[in-house]
Each structure stands twice: as C-alpha cells, then as structure tokens.
From Swiss-Prot:
Name of this chain's protein: ATP synthase subunit a
Family: Belongs to the ATPase A chain family.
Assembly and oligomerization: F-type ATPases have 2 components, CF(1) - the catalytic core - and CF(0) - the membrane proton channel. CF(1) has five subunits: alpha(3), beta(3), gamma(1), delta(1), epsilon(1). CF(0) has three main subunits: a(1), b(2) and c(9-12). The alpha and beta chains form an alternating ring which encloses part of the gamma chain. CF(1) is attached to CF(0) by a central stalk formed by the gamma and epsilon chains, while a peripheral stalk is formed by the delta and b chains.
Keyword Transmembrane helix: yes
Top-level taxon in the UniProt lineage: Bacteria
Record's subcellular location: Cell inner membrane
NCBIfam families recorded: ATP_synt_6_or_A, PRK05815.1-1
Pfam families found in the cross-reference section: ATP-synt_A
Source species of the chain: Alteromonas mediterranea (strain DSM 17117 / CIP 110805 / LMG 28347 / Deep ecotype)
Gene that this sequence comes from: atpB
GO cellular component: plasma membrane; proton-transporting ATP synthase complex
C-alpha cells in the first residue's frame, strides 16, 4: 500500500482520523470537515473504542456468568488473574473506602490495554480493508477513506479518559473533605499562613490540573510515537519485516505498561483526593 503514495502522503493518510461533521448541506465526511474544528467527530476512534469496550464487557460477563468453584478453565483462570492483579494494586495503593475504585481500575486497565493492543495490527491491513469497502459500497476513492484503528493515538480520547478521572478527583475531594475542606486544601497548602493564599492557590491549581493533563499526554504521546514508528518502518519496503518483528516484540512490554501506568496513576490520584492532609 505504501507504494501508492509518496512517503509523506502515506504517513499522513495513516495518521488521519475518519471524520464526520454537520455542514449546511447535511452530514459530511473527512476532507469536507477540514474547517469543522471542535464540532468534527472522529468516527473511527468512537467505533473502535466503543467496540473494544463492549468486547471487554462481553468477555468478562460471560466468564463471570459461567464461573465455577471447581477447576477453572483457561479463560476463567486468565480473567481471575487479571482481576486479582488489579485488586491487589488497589488494596495496596488506595487508602480510602469506596467500592467504585476496584471496578474502575479494572475497566481502565483492560479497556486501555485492548485499545493499545490495536497497535500490533499490521499498519496497512485496516486502512486497506476500509478502502476496499469504501470503494465497493460507496464508490469512494480508497485514498480518501481513513480508519485509524488505535484509539489511544487520538488526543480526543486520551483527554476524555483523563477528564473522567479529573471529575472523580474533584468529586472525592469534595465528598471526603467538604467544599470548605477542599477550598482550604487549595488555599492553605503548602504554606499555612493566610498571606500566602494567592501563591498557594496558584500552586495547588497547577498541581491539580497537571494530573489529568499528564495522564492524557503520556498515553497519547507514547502510543502516537509507537504508531508513527510502525508506519515509518512500513515505508522501507521488503526490509521492514525484521524491524516490524523487533518493534512488535518490544511493544508486547510497552503496551501493557502504558495501561498499567494509567491505571496506577488514577488510583494514586483518587487516593490523594480521599486523604485529609
């Protein structure tokens, strides 16, 4: 597929989201949405993230409904291993009391991991299949059909995940400390004298906002760079296979690690929100 484009066109095509927007003439897609700005929807990110989320729910619900007290099957043993792994991390890290944290951590870890693992799919496969479908079903030029299959390479998705965590941080901070306690935390730390309230407020606000920002940018940056390297390797022709293999093997470690880091930072931030300083 790379031979059909120049190198820059190939990279741009594979890093472009399938976009949908509303115009004066109705619903438009891709290049027609170049000026839509904030009101453009990345439909591939939505489709893949929702689809992988449903896959997670289906698998775990199926295993839970068929779980036995006897010798577990391979799938049940794997799911139990994942659940115990997440639960142990929650118990050792989260010091508050909430039944929500463990299920939240499990959902974040598995969902982000599944989205990250899409990075191991050959970079040309999904765009090529999407181009064939677009051409056969809708008469579209395959070069104008986009399908970026790794949702975590979309800054919109990583910021959406981080925003959800940020809302929970605010919720637990106010729930555990009250509005007055939360306000005191923002204005009386790290310096306890009232004269330092403006300085404290600036420092604590920056610290608070840095948490979701770092969550979103860390996940996006690592996965975007990873996908870009896969695409660059694909442009070198037949010599790409050993490099693809080595980079994919390396990613077997990196992709779960990024999901784990996102989960652990979420637990840590929520634990800090529940602590009374």
């Amino acid at each position: 597929m790379a031979s059909e484009y120049t190198t820059s066109e190939y990279i741009k095509h594979h890093l472009t989201n399938a976009t949908m927007c509303s115009t004066d003439n109705g619903i438009a897609f891709n290049k027609a949405c170049s000026d839509a700005g904030f009101w453009a929807w990345h439909v591939d990110t939505l489709a893949w993230s929702i689809g992988l989320g449903l896959l997670f729910l289906i698998i775990f619900r199926s295993v839970a409904s068929k779980a036995t007290t006897g010798v577990p099957g391979k799938m049940q043993a794997f799911v139990e291993l994942v659940v115990e792994f997440v639960d142990d991390n929650v118990k050792s890290t989260f010091h508050g009391k909430s039944a929500l944290i463990a299920p939240l951590a499990l959902t974040i870890f598995v969902w982000v991991l599944l989205m990250n693992l899409m990075d191991l799919v050959p970079v040309d496969l999904i765009p090529w299949v999407s181009g064939l479908i677009g051409q056969a079903a809708f008469g579209m030029d395959p070069h104008d059909v986009y399908n970026k299959a790794v949702p975590t390479t979309d800054l919109n998705l990583t910021f959406a995940l981080a925003s959800g965590v940020f809302i929970l941080i605010l919720f637990y901070s106010i729930k555990m400390k009250g509005i007055g306690g939360f306000a005191k935390e923002l204005t009386m730390q790290p310096f306890g004298h009232p004269i330092f309230i403006p300085v404290n407020f600036i420092l604590e606000t920056v610290t608070l906002l840095a948490r979701p920002l770092s969550l979103a940018l860390r996940l996006f940056g690592n996965l975007y760079a990873s996908e870009l390297i896969f695409i660059l390797i694909a442009t070198i022709g037949y010599f790409q296979l050993p490099l693809h293999f080595m980079w994919a093997v390396f990613h077997i470690l990196v992709l779960p690690l990024q999901a784990f880091i996102f989960m652990m930072l979420t637990i840590v931030y929520l634990s800090l929100a529940c602590e009374d300083h």
